[in-house]
């Protein structure tokens, strides 16, 4: 059972899956036609009538929630307009000021939602993907956009590590999805798919020594 489907980003892939056929395939095609004519925050729930109340009014559903969603772009280089968009997302989400040189001489990869309200930034300086930023602006939270961004990133990278301030409210989510984490001063270092101890030690050392790129007023 798939708990969430993002039509904009998942539809083409799902339609090519061998296990999706007959009635379910037709149902997904019909849902896409419906959602294409509705606002991007619209959704359709596939569930049994018995579980409909829980599906509609709680976060823990029993069926599949199909959302119109937003397309997620992946970029190695950004133009000026895209840099402005990413800066706005980061500064709005983190409530701080992005370092002026953040986009200079970068070895980064950028995921940006088509609605310009969420972004993930991957650094390749370490060899293994380092998630330098994961940001969703406040008015987009609760729509499943962050989850769609996260799943897109993980579909591209089976090994990834990142750091988060120890007081970050998203750390409970990180603890649920990571394979392990380690606290270091004001940071928590998380990782997925990294089992070699020598490689992991190098990743933790890299993460703890990265300079801050979001600055806050005193």
Go through each PLM region and give its residues.
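C-terminal catalytic "cap/lid" subdomain
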Residues: 1-160, 168-172, 179, 188-218
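Short beta-strand/turn micro-motifs composed of small residues
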Residues: 164
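Conserved acetyl-CoA-binding loop of GNAT-fold acetyltransferases
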Residues: 177-183
């Amino acid at each position: 059972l798939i708990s969430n489907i993002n039509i904009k980003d998942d539809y083409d892939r799902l339609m090519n899956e061998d296990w999706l056929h007959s009635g379910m395939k037709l149902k997904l095609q019909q849902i896409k036609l419906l959602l294409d004519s509705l606002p991007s925050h619209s959704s359709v729930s596939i569930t049994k009538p018995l579980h409909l109340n829980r599906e509609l009014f709680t976060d823990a559903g029993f069926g599949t929630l199909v959302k119109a969603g937003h397309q997620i772009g992946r970029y190695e280089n950004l133009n000026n307009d895209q840099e402005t968009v990413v800066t706005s997302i980061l500064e709005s989400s983190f409530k701080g000021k992005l370092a002026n040189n953040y986009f200079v001489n970068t070895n980064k990869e950028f995921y940006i939602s088509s609605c310009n309200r969420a972004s993930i930034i991957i650094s390749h300086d370490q060899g293994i993907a380092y998630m330098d930023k994961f940001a969703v602006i406040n008015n987009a939270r609760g729509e499943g956009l962050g989850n769609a961004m996260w799943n897109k990133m993980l579909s591209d990278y089976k090994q990834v590590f990142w750091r988060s301030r120890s007081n970050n409210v998203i750390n409970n989510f990180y603890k649920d999805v990571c394979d392990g984490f380690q606290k270091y001063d004001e940071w928590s270092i998380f990782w997925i798919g990294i089992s070699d101890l020598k490689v992991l030690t190098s990743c933790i050392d890299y993460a703890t020594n990265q300079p801050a790129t979001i600055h806050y007023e005193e």
